[in-house]
Amino acid sequence: MEERTFEMELAGRKLVVQTGKVAQQANGAAWVKYGDTVVLVTACASKEPREGIDFFPLTVEYEERLYSIGKIPGGFIKREGKPSEKAILSARLIDRPIRPLFPEGYRNDVQVIATVLSVDPDAQPEIVAMIGSSVALSISDIPFNGPTGSVAVGLVDGKFVINPTYEQREKSLMHLVVSGTKDAIVMVEAGAKEVPEETILDAIVYAHQYIKQIVEFIEGIVKEVGVPKAEVVLHEIDKELEEKVRAYATEKIYNALRTPEKKERNDNLDKVEQEVLEHFKDEYPDNLADIDEVLYKIMKEQMRKMIKEEKIRVDGRGLDDIRPIWCEVGVLPRTHGSAIFTRGQTQVLTVATLGAIGDIQILEGIGDEEFKRYMHHYNFPPYSVGEVRPLRGPGRREIGHGALAERALEPVIPSEEEFPYTIRLVSEVLSSNGSTSQASVCGSTLALMDAGVPIKAPVAGIAMGLIKEEDEVLILTDIQGIEDFLGDMDFKVAGTEKGVTAIQMDIKIPGIDRDILQMALEKARKARLYVLQKMLEVIKEPRKELSKYAPRVVRMVVNPEKIRDIIGPAGKTITKIISETGVKIDIEEDGRLYITAPNLEAGERAKQMIEAITKDIEVGGIYLGKVLRIAPFGAFVEIAPGKEGLVHISNLSKKRVRRVEDVVKVGDNILVKVTEIDKLGRIVLSRKDAMPDEEESDNRKSDNRKK
């Protein structure tokens, strides 16, 4: 392929796409540059469809290379390891807008790899990778109903900003990523600081103007260098077989679908499947997979027909009805905060743990080093859906759901100054029937309030669905698993009473317009307020007191020049304070100091020890010190942690001393006076000058008796 370069202006910066330059053996490859960010995106597909599967085998990889920011990986191996959490989330961001645009029934393996080669903090590499994936697929022979365009939108000083710079992102009230085709929106992801729904909607519409420009730009590239699409050979089911299965199974599936309870419904559907397979096994012994596919079609059609014609869902709810909700807080006696949130057959246990400031998570990647004071982890065990499978580490889904719930609560987490703790939330899915991520949002709010974290406002989440048949559009509130599986949209919205804090929208159709988005957002707000009301019936506000098992934090501000004194030589001083009090100490460069203690008494003791260190030693001051060592010429006495001086043998007493041990021994607490601090900072002490007059008089009387 001939090397070609294409350029366009996007939000005040040049977007440059080069094709035919590198990776020429891939089906499609694009070298994309935006600002100083460079991403290589490749797309490859297998020549033959994968046999025996009923899904589209698409994989997306987002490869972070630390050389892109001029760094060498840490650790012993010195090379990149498994993908970071950020890389996994970026891969999901690329995957979601392109997945619905492949032909239905396409079963060839497709792999999209985005390799980040150079990073400009002002040009987010994930946005560049999303554009690059659309280019690579569109110019290739892989069947793809694109192209798509993608942009980020910020809200800075009341104005929308496309692809905001690093500085603008820091100031922005929201971070919105929107993908779409020329005609419709296909994916939305957002984190926001209680932004009204109308503003979110306006931002999506504003983004679509730029998406259209990107799509037009990519269409121009396709005209110049695109190759003809490969012919898709889709598996066709024998018409006679399909007619017979439909005639035999449709009513049975309809009746099984009308079962309100998920497990019973699934059992009934399984029975129908087994009955149908048994009925046709002799007539069509080699077409059992085709029969399964027909049964899936019937189930999808019947569920959607029920909603469209009867306005009733499989569990008997109306389109706007929310499943029964119950909540409980303080369910675990020894944790810092805990809650169970149940909505229908979806149930999540969320546990809050408070830690020291030093427990923050340090994230190293191709962006700036990040420090996370608040984190949310999501676990989805197999028992939550009644299955048996090996327990492994968190997968992409768990990481994605955890990040969504984390983003939803982030705007209401108190600042470090208000609440000097690291906060970790863990959501354990106990039972799943749709929208576990939004149940995690609700459970997180309850657990934080139970822990006494002074959140700015409670947050709730709800998942909306869509059934779109020709011109008829039906929005479903609080979708369950089967409605997500067989419906056209999964639109998760989380927020406070005031506004939206997080959005995630995925669709299975080519796109949706503003009217559908507006309808979904309005219904989501109404549902969210209802859920919030139910939650606040259980706990109205954060508890006034922390759990007795939670650590206590004592805050101090010290002179930054005294930090090295607190730490001491080779860390001896701070280690001694920690070992004697059982606390954890975190010191910032500006002098802010946090003592995290198991109880207030230990915290106050550590504080007093630190105050003694940071207090300047004054000549003429009298201190109670501890004898650390004895030498023939005197005693070394510690008058403050890490600060010791010498009491010469001649200054131990007002009478003549022959041996130091005759007056003091190691471990004695004695009063001493600072008589001198030399140029090297060495402290000269005197015991005799610290003696009260009475002791001096007693010494004289004793001396007279001896005479």
From Swiss-Prot:
One GO MF term attached to the UniProt entry: polyribonucleotide nucleotidyltransferase activity
Reactions accelerated catalytically: RNA(n+1) + phosphate = RNA(n) + a ribonucleoside 5'-diphosphate
Binding sites annotated in the UniProt record for Mg(2+): D484, D490
Region described as Disordered: 688-707
Protein keywords: Cytoplasm, Magnesium, Metal-binding, Nucleotidyltransferase, RNA-binding, Transferase
Residue ranges constituting the S1 motif domain according to the UniProt record: 620-688
Cofactor requirement: Mg(2+)
Residue runs in coiled coils: none
Example of a GO biological process term: mRNA catabolic process
Stretches that traverse the bilayer: none
Subcellular location: Cytoplasm
EC numbers: 2.7.7.8
Domain of life the protein comes from: Bacteria
Compositionally biased tracts (Basic and acidic residues): 698-707
Domain spans labelled KH: 551-610
GO cellular component entries: cytosol
Function: Involved in mRNA degradation. Catalyzes the phosphorolysis of single-stranded polyribonucleotides processively in the 3'- to 5'-direction.
Protein family: Belongs to the polyribonucleotide nucleotidyltransferase family.
Protein name: Polyribonucleotide nucleotidyltransferase
Organism of derivation: Caldanaerobacter subterraneus subsp. tengcongensis (strain DSM 15242 / JCM 11007 / NBRC 100824 / MB4) (Thermoanaerobacter tengcongensis)
